[in-house]
Amino acid sequence: MANVSMRDMLEAGVHFGHQTRYWNPKMAPYIFGQRNKIHIINLEKTLPLYQEAMNYVGRLAAEGGKVLFVGTKRSARKAVREEASRCGMPYVDHRWLGGMLTNFRTVKGSIRRLKDLEAQAEDGTFDKLTKREALSLSREMEKLNRTLSGIKDMNGLPDAMFVIDVGFEHIAVQEARKLGIPVVAVVDTNNSPREVDYVIPGNDDAIRAIQLYLSGAADAVLEAKTATARPGGDDDFVEVDEATEQQG
């Protein structure tokens, strides 16, 4: 599950942190050293923590749990949308609306509105309206879709949240903490791991690194679902042995 080696992480640039002057001292245990005023993350720490996080995501998926993928900065959006969709998990890739979790009842109202508009567009209702009315409703639908398309099939709060860049997504992390929703997150050298349940110390800017984290999480979900769908169920779900992985 989530079969990633240290070489894969090196090639993706997972070990490159931020400039040393922007560091967060709480990340000191995960830093190997510095090179050209850039902190270098210790992949011997990252790899087992990454595997632990992926095993957790897999266990949740095996039990039918929902993991909300969150990454709204430009370098993360595409991978968040594609990998969450690939494994059938909800996602937020555009903008985190304040209250998306803590005020989920209101958000559900917006989701209902979006689904109503989509149904009207589909059944020809828009064609019976004036051009101005149809344009107004189309714009409303597009706006709602940008923000809510990834969570429109999420009927309740997620069981966990997988975050790329806890600094950029601090509001999402705060809401999850407030509701007791476990947070799995990539934490770079400029952020604090304090609010995160499953810390993955790593580069949160490089597209290749972001793709590695997200494809690993999607694979963990899909493999867990496949294992539990087979006769024998949960017994077939195999967690990754970090020691074996480090040999890669």
Curated annotation (Swiss-Prot):
Transmembrane spans: none
Pfam families: Ribosomal_S2 (PF00318)
Recorded GO CC terms: cytosolic small ribosomal subunit
Cross-referenced Gene3D superfamilies: Glucose-6-phosphate isomerase like protein, domain 1 (3.40.50.10490), Helix hairpin bin (1.10.287.610)
One annotated GO biological process: translation
Single Gene Ontology MF annotation: structural constituent of ribosome
Alphabetical keyword list: Ribonucleoprotein, Ribosomal protein
PANTHER family according to UniProt: 30S RIBOSOMAL PROTEIN S2 PROKARYOTIC AND ORGANELLAR, SMALL RIBOSOMAL SUBUNIT PROTEIN US2M
Similarity-based family: Belongs to the universal ribosomal protein uS2 family.
Listed name of the protein: Small ribosomal subunit protein uS2
